[in-house]
């Protein structure tokens, strides 16, 4: 299984100040073979401008690709926040540049962001908030096609005013089955996002996702830290790789030009 990170952000994303070069050198220092920058783009996001300067982004990553070509493979990707009201604009943006890889994510519902104990959670118990978020994710996977992997299904577990923010597969089984079934049938990848892997409940959630995705015919898994700084939680990456292998997935999916790569066995394993 290749050692990689397929979800992280640099200063090209509005919520990060990290230098792209630092991500590259940190990845090389820890033996990663391949990385993919996945900068944010969200249309009309409340409270923050998640625009993306594509010429500058591609120029910088192309320069790093050339500089480090003998040490690590670097891909250029995108994390696209999907609001189906702006489906046409989103598709135009994705098609406007030669991205290697696109993550589809849900960061807001309507005009309300799912972030940091905000309005989204008011007058909702945890289970109601999680159900609303997952239904929005289901709407995206059923009605949007222009992406490779669906990002952080546990995003709603990061935020909210609850003592226990964790999300459980069993409590959301019906919706999650529909999401996984849609991803599998459309041959989209499921992202394993290590952001919350310091909590054993997150490991259990992703273990359940992986096992059921496999049962439903899912083929492709991507792994990402969602790091907004160069430093990463390497133990969480190790835990995630172990879960992926236990579920019966022997390779992580990688992409070029938004097409799946024909992966070869890692020479470092």
Curated annotation (Swiss-Prot):
This is Histidinol-phosphatase. One of its GO terms (biological process) is L-histidine biosynthetic process. One of its GO terms (cellular component) is cytoplasm. Pathway: Amino-acid biosynthesis; L-histidine biosynthesis; L-histidine from 5-phospho-alpha-D-ribose 1-diphosphate: step 8/9. It comes from Lactococcus lactis subsp. lactis (strain IL1403) (Streptococcus lactis). Keywords: Amino-acid biosynthesis, Histidine biosynthesis, Hydrolase. Its EC number is 3.1.3.15. It holds the Pfam family PHP. It comes from the Bacteria. It catalyses: L-histidinol phosphate + H2O = L-histidinol + phosphate. GO terms for molecular function: histidinol-phosphatase activity. Belongs to the PHP hydrolase family. HisK subfamily. The gene is hisK.
């Amino acid at each position: 299984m290749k050692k990689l990170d397929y979800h992280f952000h640099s200063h090209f994303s509005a919520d990060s100040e990290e230098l792209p070069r630092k991500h590259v050198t940190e990845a090389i220092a820890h033996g990663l073979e391949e990385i993919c920058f996945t900068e944010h783009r969200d249309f009309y996001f409340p409270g923050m401008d998640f625009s993306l300067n594509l010429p500058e982004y591609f120029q910088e990553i192309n320069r790093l690709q050339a500089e480090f070509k003998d040490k690590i493979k670097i891909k250029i990707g995108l994390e696209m926040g999907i609001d189906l009201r702006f489906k046409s604009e989103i598709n135009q943006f994705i098609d406007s540049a030669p991205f290697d890889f696109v993550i589809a994510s849900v960061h807001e519902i309507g005009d309300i962001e799912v972030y940091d104990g905000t309005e989204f959670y008011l007058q909702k118990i945890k289970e109601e908030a999680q159900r609303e978020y997952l239904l929005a994710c289901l709407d995206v996977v059923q009605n949007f096609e222009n992406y490779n992997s669906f990002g952080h299904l546990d995003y709603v577990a990061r935020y909210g005013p609850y003592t226990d923010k964790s999300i459980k597969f069993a409590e959301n089984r019906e919706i999650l089955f529909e999401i996984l079934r849609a991803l599998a049938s459309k041959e989209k990848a499921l992202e394993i996002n290590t952001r919350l892997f310091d909590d054993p409940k997150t490991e259990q959630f992703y273990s359940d996702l992986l096992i059921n995705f496999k049962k439903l015919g899912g083929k492709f898994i991507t792994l990402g830290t969602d790091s907004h700084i160069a430093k990463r939680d390497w133990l969480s990456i190790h835990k995630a790789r172990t879960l992926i292998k236990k579920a019966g997935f022997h390779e992580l999916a990688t992409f070029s030009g938004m097409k799946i790569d024909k992966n070869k066995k890692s020479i470092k394993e």
